């Protein structure tokens, strides 16, 4: 990836993080309406309880590993390796969204489509912004924050199962 130290201003990073949250949540809500006819639709199985020790490990591993692996692959290799602008944006964005379609792994076509459509607007936006600016840091910060939020939700539902039951 083409990171240059000092290139990222704090206000740009903040703007990217906020826009990632808005585009990400908007994509999930819209996909929920398209696939399930419910607005807003939130898939409760995404933060279902797991053994507490795994939830604690997940809290530390998920944000770091997925942020570096996914952004390095789809932005660093995907976007940077393709010469045509729109193909460089759309192909990595497509596979970025496909990857998230199977988390959690449910062999249900509607759920897979919901997950794909949830992430597609965000992954297109991320790939477009990176293609235009070649600065991965704000995207990685936003991605890390989204992953921390997911890990915190999983930790809470795992530590206090009653919280998850209230969501159903």
Region spans (language model):
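Juxtamembrane helix-loop-helix connectors linking adjacent transmembrane helices
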Residues: 1-66, 158-168
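Transmembrane helix-loop-helix hairpins at the membrane interface
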Residues: 52-168
